[in-house]
Design a protein with these regions (language model features):
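Extreme N-terminal leader/targeting segments of oxidoreductases
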Residues: 1-35, 53-54
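Core beta-strand elements of the Rossmann-like FAD/NAD(P) dinucleotide-binding domain
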Residues: 31, 176-185
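Conserved structural-core and active-site-/substrate-pathway-adjacent residues in large, well-folded domains
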Residues: 37-39, 48, 58, 84, ...
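Active-site-adjacent segment of FAD-dependent monooxygenases/related oxidoreductases
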Residues: 72-145, 155, 162
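Short, conserved active-site loop motifs that form the nucleotide-linked donor/cofactor pocket
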Residues: 150-151
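Conserved SAM/SAH-binding loop
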Residues: 155-159, 174-175
Length: 195
């Protein structure tokens, strides 16, 4: 039985919210889903919002019950910001992030490399912006929760996938035990160790 952390992570700069797990006993039997997304990080959340923009419903499975701890993604490029604008969260990123154009690398007190990104006055976004990943994830989570086409299931971990001719069958573990889910399409966005 999957038991994700159910106490807020400790942080001096971010207030973690623990979301209630989606439990199979509280929902009707599962029918064939159009799209299932495994992984509720920036890629999975953005994919769900993009699908919803085109009217495609999806189920988004996240093994944890809160957004990530620390930042595996902290710098977002202009192109990333354009995608985030499409899904409705770019304004929050620019409002709270730190934009920059220059970067320096130092070794033993001496600058050994300087990077300068081009920027035109007509560009909608700066070349890069820094924002901790948990803030970006929270903005994306809030957008997903506001969209009726997205079924966000916290505390649901994919443990096995079987490919069939016309669908995928997933074994999903939750804090109360496993259930089976079938999908016409499966998006694996559960990180570098996906498999």
């Amino acid at each position: 039985m999957h038991q994700p952390a159910n106490a807020p992570r400790h942080s001096i700069y971010y207030d973690y919210t623990v979301h209630q797990p989606w439990l199979p006993s509280e929902h009707p039997a599962q029918s064939l889903q159009r799209v299932v997304i495994a992984g509720g990080g920036p890629v999975g959340l953005t994919a769900a919002l993009e699908l919803a923009r085109y009217g495609v419903p999806c189920v988004l499975l996240e093994s944890e019950q809160q957004v990530c701890e620390g930042s595996r993604a902290i710098v977002f490029t202009r192109r990333s910001m354009e995608i985030l604008q499409q899904v409705g969260v770019a304004h929050r990123v620019t409002q709270n992030g730190l934009p920059w154009r220059f970067g320096n690398s130092f070794y033993r007190g001496e600058r050994v490399f300087r990077m300068e990104a081009p920027h035109d006055d007509n560009d909608r976004f700066g070349p890069m912006i820094n924002l901790q990943q948990q803030f970006l994830e929270q903005y994306l989570v809030e957008a997903c929760q506001a969209n009726p086409l997205i079924d966000l299931r916290w505390g649901n971990r994919v443990t096995a996938v079987t490919q069939h001719a016309d669908h995928a069958q997933l074994q999903v573990d939750t804090p109360e035990g496993p259930y089976t889910l079938q999908a016409e399409w499966l998006v694996a966005s559960d990180g570098a160790r996906s498999g």
